[in-house]
């Protein structure tokens, strides 16, 4: 059985993000003796209770706009509660924002300074305009959506796209199972072979570094977490991918970085990958 129908490296964006995936508060100056976090720490327990109570009565709206990063700072005092309430969709918490796609059914957090891929945003706007249009759809030449194209992608503003995270959702048979390809190591090695063209390109080398399974026993879901690097004379890239099959869909989150920047961004990449969950 071949993985090629399910994993590929076909996407390339001409604007903010160029991907190579498989389907796969300012502090004032002065003599301050305590930091803002130390001053606020006695209020954390009280804040936790009030935040939980406030949600039930809608008083959480009193937090208001994120002026000067104040809201994000306060929520950062208790990041677990804020994230459980999905407040990081609106306000960054602990340096991360949340992406929730209720249509495709997944979520993850990503560095709050990153922005969405403009090509995908424009395409989504065009799709919405077409769906809301009163005009009849064209009878011919309707372009089929590329199933290997990410539904979301984020990266640092103004970057070349070498550092990014994206999610691809592909339709598969309801009976499709990643487990059929073997354990995490076998799956990882097969994906690396697919990414590198199964050895057909002598100048492209892939190495599987880590492979594991994160299991959601409550929902009977298995997330295959893979770390690998791809090297060629033109680039050296470090990837962390998460794959999960559910209800006739194959979900693949791929986070990548230049090998030269890996030591600086690996904590953010790992955090993003570990946060990926299916919510459908």
From Swiss-Prot:
InterPro entries noted in UniProt: Mog1/PsbP_a/b/a-sand, PsbP_C
Gene Ontology biological process terms, A to Z: photosynthesis
Compartment(s): Plastid, Chloroplast
GO molecular function term, any single one: calcium ion binding
Keyword Chloroplast: yes
Keywords (A to Z) from UniProt: Chloroplast, Plastid, Transit peptide
Family in the record: Belongs to the PsbP family.
Cited NCBIfam families: PSII_PsbP
The name this protein goes by in its record: PsbP domain-containing protein 7, chloroplastic
Species of provenance: Arabidopsis thaliana (Mouse-ear cress)
Underlying gene: PPD7
